[in-house]
């Protein structure tokens, strides 16, 4: 779960290579080791070449984010599914266990000991995270993956204007163009979805049910846009004061959300034997359990792959990859979940894809202009914070 991500919100980052880098990512071996004989040296050299290969990093990042979205959609797509808080609690528990295991065997070396004072200060951010991930799963439950992916772009607009209001940010004319395209793609997607619902059923009652489902999905999506922007802006404000390093924010986010999610599940969700049987039918029970466990590990994978991508490329390339990755995520919904393929839905995906490219281009130009000017402030977010944030979204 971590900061859930899979959603590629672009945050300003330095392009000069001074960002924090994940210490567990493999580095190129020294020249003396490369000249040695024996299979061990050859294997190490091959692994080092892969670890420093930009296409491999980009592919790993794309596959991890796509798989996270697909798995989340699969788990919450059951007709009787109503245990979202429980699902998110399992994600957080699996993620914490994975982090502690990686620390124990030495893969993660820079995780600070738990601090009660920091936990109290970070707890409000974790509450915002609960709101973001819960509304995200509810929206994904009622909407198709392409529509969900397209509407997530609206969060970028909310964050941009939140930065203008609270952090003195600015929005360039090119960014405004991308925002217009994002809104247009959302309108086209909603129109295509509604048309498909109206004409897709053989009986008026089916169309009415489909419209009600879409309305619920749009309502949850609107709340998710608000919660996502509040969480990311709140995290930006607090993270500098906390002096969190690579894995600290992921660790605290998951650890602090576990009790909240468990309490919410016990209070708000039905734990009767009959309801558990409806949520976990025998024919798909094992697959659901595997998906829930993978979703927790997926947060680690996305964080690792995004940090890897940042390390071997540039933040501009990383932002562009995030924009381009919207297309395969949307297509995955068409492939795996039989989302309606209509002229409207395809047009919405294409417009959303173009809006992401335009936005990434706008951020690249803004970053280039900032580098040519004298620095007046510190970068707002490190590579590790960016990677943890991406693990939020799927």
Curated annotation (Swiss-Prot):
It comes from Pyricularia oryzae (strain 70-15 / ATCC MYA-4617 / FGSC 8958). NCBIfam families: nst. Belongs to the TPT transporter family. SLC35D subfamily. It comes from the Eukaryota. It is a multi-pass membrane protein. Residues 1-55, 102-121, 168-173, 235-246, 309-316, 363-394 are cytoplasmic. One of its GO terms (cellular component) is endoplasmic reticulum membrane. This is GDP-mannose transporter. Keywords: Cytoplasmic vesicle, Endoplasmic reticulum, Golgi apparatus, Membrane, Sugar transport, Transmembrane, Transmembrane helix, Transport. It is found in: Golgi apparatus membrane; Cytoplasmic vesicle membrane; Endoplasmic reticulum membrane.
């Amino acid at each position: 779960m971590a900061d859930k991500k899979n959603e590629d919100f672009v945050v300003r980052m330095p392009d000069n290579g001074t960002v924090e880098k994940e210490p567990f990512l493999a580095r190129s071996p020294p020249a003396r080791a490369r000249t040695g004989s024996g299979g061990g040296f050859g294997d190490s050299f091959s692994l080092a070449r892969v670890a420093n290969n930009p296409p491999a990093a980009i592919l790993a990042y794309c596959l991890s984010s796509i798989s996270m979205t697909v798995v989340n959609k699969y788990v919450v797509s059951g007709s009787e599914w109503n245990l979202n808080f429980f699902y998110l609690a399992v994600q957080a528990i699996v993620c914490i266990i994975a982090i502690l295991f990686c620390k124990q065997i030495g893969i993660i070396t820079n995780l600070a000991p738990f601090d009660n004072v920091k936990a109290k200060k970070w707890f409000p951010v974790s509450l915002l995270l609960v709101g973001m991930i819960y509304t995200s799963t509810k929206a994904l439950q009622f909407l198709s993956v392409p529509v969900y992916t397209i509407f997530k772009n609206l969060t970028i607009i909310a964050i941009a204007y939140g930065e203008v209001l609270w952090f003195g940010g600015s929005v360039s004319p090119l960014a405004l163009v991308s925002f217009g395209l994002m809104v247009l793609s959302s309108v086209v997607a909603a129109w295509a979805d509604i048309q498909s619902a109206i004409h897709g059923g053989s009986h008026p009652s089916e169309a009415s049910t489909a419209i009600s489902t879409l309305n619920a999905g749009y309502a949850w999506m609107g709340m998710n846009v608000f919660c996502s922007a509040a969480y990311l802006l709140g995290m930006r404000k607090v993270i500098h004061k906390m002096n969190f390093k690579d894995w600290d924010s992921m660790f605290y986010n998951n650890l602090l959300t576990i009790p909240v999610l468990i309490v919410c599940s016990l209070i708000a969700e039905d734990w009767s034997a009959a309801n558990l049987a409806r949520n976990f039918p025998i024919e798909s029970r094992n697959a659901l359990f595997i998906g829930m466990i993978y979703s927790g590990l997926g947060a680690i994978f996305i964080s690792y792959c995004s940090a890897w991508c940042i390390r071997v490329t540039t933040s501009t390339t990383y932002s562009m990859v995030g924009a381009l990755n919207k297309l395969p995520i949307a297509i995955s919904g068409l492939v795996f979940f039989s989302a309606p393929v209509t002229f409207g839905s395809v047009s919405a995906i294409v417009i959303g894809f173009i809006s992401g490219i335009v936005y990434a281009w706008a951020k690249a130009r803004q970053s280039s202009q900032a580098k040519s000017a004298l620095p007046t402030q510190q970068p707002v977010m490190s590579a590790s914070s960016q990677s943890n944030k991406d693990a939020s979204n799927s």
